[in-house]
Amino acid sequence: MAPMGIRLSPLGVAVFFLLGLGVLYHLYSGFLAGRFSLFGLGGEPAGGAAEVAVDGGTVDLREMLAVAVLAAERGGDEVRRVRESNVLHEKSKGKTREGAEDKMTSGDVLSNRKMFYLLKTAFPNVQINTEEHVDASDKEVIVWNRKIPEDILKEIAAPKEVPAESVTVWIDPLDATQEYTEDLRKYVTTMVCVAVNGKPVLGVIHKPFSEYTAWAMVDSGSNVKARSSYNEKTPKIIVSRSHAGMVKQVALQTFGNQTLIIPAGGAGYKVLALLDVPDMTQEKADLYIHVTYIKKWDICAGNAILKALGGHMTTLSGEEISYTGSDGIEGGLLASIRMNHQALVRKLPDLEKSGH
């Protein structure tokens, strides 16, 4: 007697084979959809941070610098256009820790959109952190033409590849929003910074209303330089307009009555004050001090530029700032160039306590 079992005709075998192929196809297409979503083709996550692709290969920092300059300038165009229209659509995002209004305008939003999507389209596999919310429903594809400007090629002759997963981009689409609403245009900047493994390696600070752009890459090149001299004994100290009096009291005790305090808006503007900037609207200072909480997108670009030029930006206790993790720092800020930075840190032991 023949063993019991199921016999399939050739047609049945073919049907089972096709069903198997169908199952495999759906499994594989689902896998691909997941991969594509990681590469930014399936929409942006909520908030100001973009997802990072898994195993994203490498990116060229020289190309990133070229796109960062373009992004800062494109964002600056939006900032200038909105300000000159005199229709800012100003609103408050809430209060800062010091109790001031945290303002936002159409200039912030439109600049953020241009800057974020230009960088995201060019480098879909890197983490991008930005001050303003990224609206996934308002997605825009802005294509970079892959041309590196001659001034960058002149300073940085060769590509510099790094793993995409090691990169974090910090965008400030409009620094000094308070001053922007007051029409104090000289303080306003747009900024882009690239950090690798938390260390700032390239920065761009663009002034939309004078159309000046400073950029630098650590261990590579820059289009800006330090000034020829600085006054370390009785320095001019640039500080935020909101707490100039607080810093002045301690600075006079530390450096003497000849010390000059320069109140100013915008972290980008304050860093440029330490450098040799060919802009008649730019004030000059020897030190930049900040004594309260500050966000990393405000300072990363300036930190990278100072570092590339041999300068320093640390907390008030002298600690290096890591551009990973949280989006702010608690320990205040001290920035200098061509000075004994650690000696300055030791001179200012009480400033951080004064800021809280």
Swiss-Prot record:
**Compartments it resides in:** Golgi apparatus; Golgi apparatus, trans-Golgi network membrane
Regulation of this protein's activity per its record:
Strongly inhibited by lithium.
The family database entries (PANTHER family) matched by this protein are listed as: 3'(2'),5'-BISPHOSPHATE NUCLEOTIDASE 1, GOLGI-RESIDENT ADENOSINE 3',5'-BISPHOSPHATE 3'-PHOSPHATASE
Pathways involved? Sulfur metabolism
Organism classification: Eukaryota, Metazoa, Chordata, Craniata, Vertebrata
The name under which this protein is listed is: Golgi-resident adenosine 3',5'-bisphosphate 3'-phosphatase
Spans annotated as Disordered: 82-104
One GO cellular component term:
trans-Golgi network membrane
Organism expressing this protein natively: Rattus norvegicus
